[in-house]
């Protein structure tokens, strides 16, 4: 390590905790990127949720607000054997794979039973990445909304139903 730092040996104060909040909601695997001077954070609902949310901020370190549902991971996998994963995890954003107007995510899945990873029909389809392309994500904060009050971008799934 280099630079000025110190080991914290006491519980943070309420003020320090408030200062350190990136967002008010919990989640996992956050990814931050910049588009036209606004910073966006995408994050999986916690814990191991199927809902993927997007937030926005004026700064890369937050606070991120305006949580909006970006897309929901499917309940089943497009695979042989048992199509129901125990959970989706490790949502990753791939900016290098994203084209204009889209976001590309990958994620993995767990089987319900650890031993289903081996010598079962479709076992190779667990623990492999599944890719999702989200089109028109820039319009998620537009004022035109659907019946549920949220604008929904278009999602294309590669490897999942």
Regions found by a protein language model. Give the residues of each.
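Carbohydrate-active catalytic/glycan-binding domains of CAZyme proteins
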Residues: 1-161
